[in-house]
Amino acid sequence: MSNFLSLCNTRASVRDYLPTLPTTEAIARVKEAVRLAPSACNKQPWRFFYVTNPEILAQLCQTYPRPWLTTAPALFVAVKNVAENWVRPADNHAHGDIDLAIAVEHLCLAAAEEGLGTCWICNFDIEACAAVLELSEEWQPVAMTPIGYPGEKHQDAGRKRKPADEVFVDLV
C-alpha cells in the first residue's frame, strides 16, 4: 500500500484524547499543510483558529455539547470569508465551504501523519461560535475539529466503506 493510502486508512474520527498538548513542531507542520491547501482561483477564503486557552475551549465546547469533546486539549475552528468566496458564474454557487473542506481535510491528514487524532464537527451552533471568536459579519464558522493524541478509550470502529463499484462510474 502506498504511504498516502496508508495515511488515508490511518485517519479516523477520534472521540477521546489524552490531556497532553500536541508539540509546537507537530502543530506547525499541520498548519503548513493547511496553508498549502488549494482553493478555487486560489482565493483562500479562510482563517483557522488554533485554540488551547482553557476558557475559550470551554466556551467552544458548549457550541457542540458532547462530553467527549471536552477531553481534547486543543481545537481548530475553520471560518470562511463570505466576501472572498469564488462564485461559479453559471449558477452563482459560492465555493467557500468546498474550499474550506479541502483545507480541513489537509489538516486531518497532516494530523494523522503526526500521530494526532481529529474529528470533523459541522453540527455546532455557528452563531455562538462566532460570538466566542468575536467574528465580524464577513467571517462564518464552517467546521471545527479537536486535535490531540488519541486517548485510551479511542477505538477504531473499523470504518465501513462502500465497495468501489458503488462509488465509481467508469465511462470508457
Each predicted region: which residue ranges?
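Glycine/small-residue-rich phosphate/adenosyl-binding loop
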Residues: A26-A28, E32, L36-A103
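Structural motif
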Residues: P73-L75, T118, Q140-V142
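Short, electropositive alpha-helical surface patch
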Residues: A128-V142
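Small-aliphatic-rich amphipathic alpha-helix that forms the alpha element of a beta-alpha
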Residues: V34, F76, D91-V132
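Short secondary-structure boundary segments
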Residues: K80, N123-F124, Y149
